[in-house]
UniProtKB/Swiss-Prot annotation:
The lineage of its organism: Eukaryota, Metazoa, Chordata, Craniata, Vertebrata. This is Spermatid nuclear transition protein 3. Involved in nuclear basic protein transition: histones are replaced by spermatid specific proteins which are themselves replaced by protamines in late spermatids. Keywords: Chromosome, Developmental protein, Differentiation, DNA-binding, Nucleosome core, Nucleus, Spermatogenesis. It comes from the Eukaryota. The gene is TNP3. GO terms for molecular function: DNA binding. Residues 1-11 have a biased composition (Polar residues). Residues 16-34 have a biased composition (Basic residues). Residues 1-34, 56-76 are annotated as: Disordered. It comes from Sus scrofa. GO terms for biological process: cell differentiation; spermatogenesis. It is found in: Nucleus; Chromosome. One of its GO terms (cellular component) is nucleus.
Length: 76
């Protein structure tokens, strides 16, 4: 009996799906102050979660500088 070798093909569809799932979409805040969560190391076997809640730090976004008109404009 002949043994036919199947040409090995990588499963591209499943890997593509996995890659898409692995990268989460970043929440984009429009015109709001972003909240950055500081990672707090919690001690083991502690039930009270209120005590060790992640610290929320609000950072003000830098405003883009508006282009100012040149004081000394060249006369055509």
């Amino acid at each position: 009996a002949k043994v036919t070798e199947k040409s090995w093909q990588p499963q591209t569809t499943s890997t593509k799906r996995w890659k898409k799932r692995k990268t989460p979409s970043q929440p984009r805040s429009r015109g709001k102050v972003r909240k950055i969560y500081k990672k707090v190391k919690r001690p083991l076997h502690v039930c009270s979660r209120k005590k060790y809640s992640p610290k929320v730090i609000t950072t003000s976004r830098r405003q883009k500088r508006a282009r100012r008109a040149n004081k000394f404009e060249t006369i055509p």
